[in-house]
């Protein structure tokens, strides 16, 4: 059953578009199924927060249930559920046990996804970087743990890389997020240079609605 669960997670990782490769061939072969399980957990949770036409209350309820199931998996008793979701937690439970993963890193991811439901703009760099600390940095630390590294220096370097990649990802998807009423550029940037927002709207991506969207 566990092998089939890992295979389902690996299929999800292969089939879902991402800006960066998932379970890359550059990773040790033994690590790839574990990375796929982590990805499947995070991908589903991110979709709860960001995709479809659910209300904010429905999104938050799904994330709360995902957190409950996370802690059940951490205690080696993954709960039953829809077939694809059960696969995720069967695989994740084994991955967490074999790789001795810190469940708090997964919880940080869920807190960031929940924040996405309720927060669409950031006033300061500190606020945006705190969000990135929870939405991106846990992934790098989990990869290190899967590969057998537990080192504060490596964690620090990984955090810097993950935050940088997260910011690059935000700004690559600026037009798409703007159309959803969300903007990952701090208000203090535009306060310091008021013309920047106007120029971004006029030069950014008229073809896909960027210029006409108006986040708060």
Regions found by a protein language model. Give the residues of each.
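Acidic catalytic motifs of isoprenoid enzymes
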Residues: 1-216
């Amino acid at each position: 059953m566990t092998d089939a669960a890992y295979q389902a997670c690996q299929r999800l990782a292969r089939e879902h578009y991402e800006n960066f490769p998932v379970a890359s061939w550059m990773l040790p072969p033994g690590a790839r199924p574990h990375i796929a399980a982590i990805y499947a957990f995070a991908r589903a949770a991110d979709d709860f927060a960001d995709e479809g036409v659910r209300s904010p209350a429905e999104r938050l309820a799904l994330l709360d249930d995902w957190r409950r199931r996370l802690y059940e998996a951490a205690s080696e008793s993954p709960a039953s559920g829809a077939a694809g979701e059960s696969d995720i937690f069967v695989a994740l439970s084994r991955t967490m046990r074999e790789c001795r993963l810190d469940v708090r890193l997964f919880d940080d991811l869920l807190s960031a996804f929940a924040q996405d439901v309720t927060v669409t703009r950031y006033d300061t760099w500190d606020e945006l970087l705190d969000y990135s600390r929870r939405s991106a940095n846990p992934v790098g630390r989990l990869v290190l743990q899967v590969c057998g590294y537990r080192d504060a220096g490596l964690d620090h370097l990984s955090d810097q890389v993950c935050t940088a990649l997260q910011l690059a990802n935000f700004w690559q998807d600026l037009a798409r997020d703007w159309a959803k009423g969300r903007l990952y550029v701090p208000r203090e940037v535009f306060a310091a240079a008021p013309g920047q927002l106007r120029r971004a709207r006029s030069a950014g991506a008229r073809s896909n609605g960027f210029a006409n969207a108006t986040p708060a």
